[in-house]
Design a protein with these regions (language model features):
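Ferredoxin-reductase
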Residues: 31, 37-112
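Short, contiguous clusters of charged residues that form electrostatic/catalytic patches at enzyme active sites
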Residues: 21-32, 76, 80, 120, ...
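Gly/Ser/Thr-enriched, mixed-charge loops and adjacent short helices
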Residues: 13, 104-145
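An N-terminal, well-structured beta->alpha segment
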Residues: 1-66, 137-145
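Mixed-charge, polar/low-complexity N-terminal
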Residues: 21, 86-88, 94, 118, ...
Length: 145
């Protein structure tokens, strides 16, 4: 796995390191880890954020869960909504990094930072899924959320 957890999530060059395939698999791995039926997803205004959010939502929903699109919002709003709704959440943003980067910042239910154990578990799930999922995930496979 080329990308691994840094502080609260993963970051990389959008569509090069942080590919749609990786983002969809990240979503599935996170959904499997939390076994949650509902997720919140927010994003920033980067050009890559909307398509990445769509693939992320597909991954999160692949285990039968529901995904709520918060739209373009600041990261603290995603954390606050996660806390209020007691749902895990993901923010698609690379924060202060350059425009070509993007990232996935994940919050546990209640807006909490993930434990090291949860991060390691998600990383292992991603590694396992990357080995078993076909190499090409096309834009047509991403359904709007």
């Amino acid at each position: 796995m080329a990308l691994s957890f840094g502080t609260d999530g993963v970051r990389g060059i959008a569509h090069s390191e942080l590919t749609t395939k990786f983002v969809q698999i990240f979503g599935r791995a996170a959904a499997e880890e939390f076994q949650s039926c509902s997720w919140l997803v927010g994003r920033d205004t980067r050009e890559s954020s909307l398509p990445l959010a769509k693939f992320l939502a597909n991954g999160l929903a692949s285990t039968g869960g529901e995904v709520f699109d918060l739209g373009v919002v600041p990261t603290p709003l995603v954390a606050a909504a996660s806390k209020i709704e007691e749902m895990p959440a993901v923010m698609v943003s690379a924060s202060h990094n350059i425009w070509s980067d993007n990232g996935l910042k994940i919050f546990g239910p209640g807006g909490l930072k993930l434990s090291d154990g949860s991060q390691k578990s998600i990383e292992q799930r991603i590694k396992n899924l990357l080995e078993t999922v076909p190499n090409e995930i096309s834009e047509q496979q991403a359904t709007p959320y």
